[in-house]
Design a protein with these regions (language model features):
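Active-site "lid/cap" and pocket-lining segments within catalytic core domains
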Residues: 1-155
Length: 155
């Protein structure tokens, strides 16, 4: 028997249920989805993360799970390096899509996302990152910044 096909909603800094493009995308698909949050052990050790920040995230996830329980859904809270966690999930499921918001943060989160993108490409997983805050990752200069800003503003 084959693995269960699933989509994954990867919650990063966008801890909410209202007006959430990743949840909306997962709901519009005809396969089950697994909402996850990863306390990435490679990221939380950096000095820009505090116990207060981690407590806020934990309590926000508890609140989301209270709301999702009426839909028989729950955010699975995971701890470890993100790539290792996605490899483990791939051993359990046939991952079709990963839906998340594009994160803008520290260099380490950018490097993590590059590793996850390579993993997705190697395993034929579609990773759809929704634009959240008008930041365009990976650009080398600000040429066409005004044009890009207007496009994002009116999407």
């Amino acid at each position: 028997m084959g693995k269960l096909a699933v989509n994954i909603v990867w919650i990063k800094r966008d801890i909410r249920t209202i007006d959430h493009d990743s949840f909306n995308a997962a709901e519009s698909e005809n396969i089950p989805y697994l909402p996850i949050y990863i306390f990435d052990s490679d990221l939380i050790k950096h000095r820009d993360t505090s116990d207060r920040h981690l407590g806020f995230i934990f309590n926000s996830l508890k609140d989301i799970n209270r709301k999702l329980s009426s839909y028989n859904k729950e955010v699975k809270v995971l701890y470890g390096p993100s790539l290792k966690i996605f490899k483990s999930l791939l051993n359990q499921y046939k991952i079709e899509n990963i839906f998340s918001y594009q994160e803008s943060g520290i260099k380490q989160s950018w490097q993590r996302d590059i590793r996850i993108k390579i993993f997705c490409d190697e395993n034929s997983i579609n990773w759809l990152e929704f634009q959240r805050d008008g930041i365009i990752r990976g650009i080398k200069n600000r040429r066409n910044w005004n044009k890009n800003f207007i496009i994002i503003l009116y999407l």
